[in-house]
């Protein structure tokens, strides 16, 4: 039975030149797990928000949306609140109370549920989601993964019939993201709750999805099973092909025959079968020789930092050197201290012990404001922290008065068509690109990036990687904190692991990711039974072809 039926939905924002949604028609059946994907700005979030009246954007709309056969605008607010659960990308946008236990109960209180029922459901959700150990904690003390799990538990306490999730793992580390998606799979399979999710990082979702919907420029262009969608994207040489799980990409790049693998396990089996009769003679790629870098652009020596006098230390004797002209990527769990390191380097927080030197000079010894004049800039995790103007054009003008330079950077970040838009009307990926443009306009020598690929589609991510390479080749130094392990493996000069307030290991991507079990890529986990240090889909395909040629 259809839970949602959308008929000819078109929508445009006020004063917008083009429609954001154009004649979208689809059905979502009860109990389905559906993945919605597409490039940033293609209309995914706008479509999802139309499925809950209280979140529907303002603008011009035509078409019809039915929920359980009833027009959505005729379904009362209480029914929508309980039956349609919605999880946003940023966990902080949805949390409204200060205690975990109160957040779990808040939605039920607003629905007028009895105290006894609230107690039962809160207890049940705490057990199901493993929240008991932090049930009494302040929400402010939770990691990003815990906050997002709390959001999901709070919504599930209201026993929704469908869960709508808009890039829910965008701010989670790989392990927290995997745990979150496994919980979502359990909810769908064991409770029968319908799931509609949009996610750029589709590695863990493709194998469990019943259907995949693909949007382009506001239109629904594909609606099929995961394997059929993968074949279609490959046949069309679609820019969305890099979105596919690594085992599928390796399979198609190797001209594999038979059924494409969806999971690491299936990919490992396929690869093992390929080499069953021939032992590979070339098992590893040369460890990429490091570029010749200059003197350290950033040197951190024995730095200790805490946010409050009585609070625990966040940075614990941190030592770190970043050579000039290097792309230095830092990975690690939520709450390990990665973002705190960037904030401490740029002076937003102060260490109480140790030294931080930027280009050989302690940051405290730079004259007021000089550190940020063509020297150091930072892209924060939340791009909206940089927005203070009424449109994108004014945001860029604030950073650099030269119109030619503004247009050059706008073209580089692919935001020329957004110049007259309000920054808060943009999608998450578009906001990220605008914030990046603002930062690049300061022409820094040392660029700090906190989750720069969050919300970016695979196409722009590839172009962004080329931009970073060009900038580092020209001498800029980039320090990047990221949960995007694949992006780091493909593009970093040096990768480092952050744990418990310190850097505990670093090396070239093939050295670093080739030896990890969890903080590594799906390509590496899939191929390590055959190859030694292949960390990207391209690495696996290259070794495959070198040993077997083009034939699968």
Describe each PLM feature range.
Residues 60-70, 354-362, 372:
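Conserved ABC transporter NBD signature motif
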Residues 52, 346:
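Helix-to-loop junction immediately C-terminal to a conserved catalytic motif
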Residues 116-134, 403-418:
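Conserved ABC ATPase "signature" region
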Residues 163-166, 447-450:
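Catalytic Walker B motif of ABC-type/P-loop ATPase nucleotide-binding domains
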Residues 215, 219-251, 502-526:
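Conserved beta-strand-loop-alpha-helix hinge in the C-terminal portion
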Residues 138-142, 422-426, 430:
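Conserved ABC ATPase signature
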Residues 235-296, 519-552:
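ABC ATPase nucleotide-binding domains
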